[in-house]
A protein has these predicted regions:
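Short hydrophobic alpha-helices at membrane interfaces in multi-pass membrane enzymes
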Residues: 102-112, 146-164, 191-196
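Terminal, low-structured helical/coil segments at or just beyond the last alpha-helical repeat
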Residues: 439, 460, 496-519
Length: 519
């Protein structure tokens, strides 16, 4: 009876771990899954597998990426991740069972501690899933070897077997092999410290000989456990501001504009990234002219930030460029973002957008290269095949120049962007971004987002003369029944020289002036 109770207790604990983790990732943190998925592109090819396992820890990395690709479907990704946490808890529970004479409820609860540590560690957005996969595999292999007695308990034969097995496991899972070594030392009851020290020395010499191209520090701490080379996970947990920005980017990616505006009213993260996301959402709801200064604005970079070589900052600006019709700028920002992924991986999200930009510009040969890559993935394959068929149809029509009537028709996304984009290629500096918005509007007066961004950028820059000069464009091309509230407030502020109580724009101007004086 007691055995049955213990068995049900243990399985009940595992079920609770699975349910808790599933709800955490699917209900509260789906944006964290999306963040991880968008910075890799798992390919279903033999070459990709060989490329991965040619590096130490490559198999764990391959398995981790295999799981992460399913984060594209949130509930499925959350389910697989929850199952991995359950696997971690179960292998630890079995290990404790093998090391103790009896399994008490306290021992079962102790099996939750490594799960909690791994969960908290994964709050660092740069921790890769391969770390957790490697830990599970290390404990699991040690448990199997110990249970079957494959290498014996003591003696030179057992040590020789470990010397052969440890490098093999290292090549599969990376430095997490030392978890295996420690467990085996406990299982075999080795009493001589020189044996473990000698084993470590042999392993270090083998790694230095096999991996001359990698710094020993990186080889010993993992090539694929952390996104940033030669750095280590931070014990930071789930930083509220960081994950709020990740959530906004996730909502932008999925075009959930109402949720962005709602969240912006509840919690603000005072960064240009946050402003870019919120202002883009306002523009898509045609609320930018009315409500822009109801929210925090970081300054001249509140609509579009200048080029920044990291893997996150430029994403909302790239999405804004795409919807404005500044296709080349969107492509440049997405390309720079992809090349800024420090572990050298590709991005499914960026690759898809780059291909779309090439299609809009009529660069079909280069677009096909991106499409061919996406066809080897799981969740981007259907889109890639659809784009390939569309390009073939347009090519067969023998169109010498891109035509909005193709690529899905004039009312398709590609058709609209071809009508809105610049017709000539030229260079511009970030300081002239307001002029670029104005040129977009003159190129196509139906581009209401360009109109909103043009006037908003002048207000952000403090260019009140330009704003007054071009305000009539809002009446002429904006489709407004009355002047937007934000523009009315700005005009009152300008006319009263900022002495307007409760004016959102006046408050913005005063804050900018105070910040500049502080510098």
């Amino acid at each position: 009876m007691k055995k049955a109770v213990k068995r049900y207790w243990n399985w009940g604990l595992s079920v609770l771990v699975g349910i808790g983790m599933f709800l955490f990732w699917y209900v509260w943190y789906p944006h964290a899954l999306s963040y991880q998925e968008q910075y890799q592109l798992f390919l279903w090819t033999g070459d990709y597998f060989v490329e991965k396992i040619s590096l130490p820890g490559g198999f764990a990395d391959w398995v981790g990426e295999f799981i992460v690709q399913f984060y594209y479907v949130e509930w499925l990704g959350a389910l697989l991740l929850a199952m991995l946490f359950v696997a971690l808890q179960r292998v630890i529970l079995r290990l404790l069972n093998s090391l103790t004479s009896h399994l008490s409820p306290l021992t079962s609860i102790l099996s939750l501690l490594p799960v909690a540590v791994m969960w908290w560690l994964m709050g660092d957005i740069n921790v890769m899933l391969s770390l957790m996969v490697a830990v599970v595999m290390a404990i699991g292999i040690a448990g199997i070897v110990g249970k079957l007695g494959l290498l014996g308990r003591v003696g030179s034969l057992g040590i020789a077997g470990e010397i052969v097995l440890v490098p093999m496991i290292y090549w599969l899972i990376g430095p997490a092999v030392w978890i295996y070594v420690i467990i085996r030392v406990i299982q075999t009851g080795w009493r001589q410290l020189w044996t473990a020290g000698w084993l470590v020395a042999v392993q270090l010499m083998v790694y230095a000989w096999l991996l001359p191209q990698w710094p020993l520090q990186q080889a010993m701490t993992g090539l694929s456990y952390y996104r940033i080379p030669l750095q280590y996970p931070q014990w930071s947990g789930y930083d509220k501001d960081m994950y709020e920005l990740i959530r906004l980017d996730y909502l932008v990616r999925n075009e959930r504009w109402d949720e962005i505006v709602k969240r912006a009213g509840e919690y603000q993260v005072k960064t240009p990234f946050w402003c870019n996301c919120v202002n883009l959402a306002l523009s898509q709801k045609r609320l930018l002219a009315d409500r822009m200064f109801d929210f925090y604005q970081s300054g001249e970079d509140a609509l579009i930030i200048p080029r920044t070589r990291d893997l996150t900052s430029m994403l909302p600006s790239a999405e804004a460029f795409w919807r404005l019709g500044m296709v080349n700028s969107a492509q440049r920002y997405m390309f720079d973002t992809q090349e800024s992924i420090l572990n050298g991986k590709k991005s499914g999200r960026c690759t898809k957008r780059i291909a779309e930009c090439m299609i809009v510009n009529g660069h079909y040969q280069t677009a096909r290269k991106q499409i061919d890559i996406l066809k080897k993935s799981l969740f981007y394959r259907s889109w890639a095949e659809e784009m390939e068929a569309m390009i073939e149809a347009e090519t067969e029509a023998d169109q010498t120049t891109p035509n909005p009537s193709y690529s899905g028709g004039e009312n398709s996304v590609f058709g609209k962007l071809r009508k809105m984009r610049y017709k000539e290629s030229f260079l511009y500096s970030y300081e002239e971004i307001d002029k670029m918005f104005g040129l977009l509007l003159m190129n196509n007066t139906d581009n209401k987002m360009a109109l909103d961004y043009f006037l908003a950028q002048m207000l952000l820059n403090g260019n009140v003369q330009g704003f007054q000069q071009y305000l009539g464009l809002a009446q002429q091309y904006g489709g407004y029944r009355q002047m937007p509230l934000g523009y009315q407030d700005a005009m009152r502020c300008i006319q009263a020289q900022g002495n307007v109580a409760g004016s959102p724009y006046a408050n913005y101007v005063k804050r900018m002036m105070a910040e500049r004086r502080g510098k």
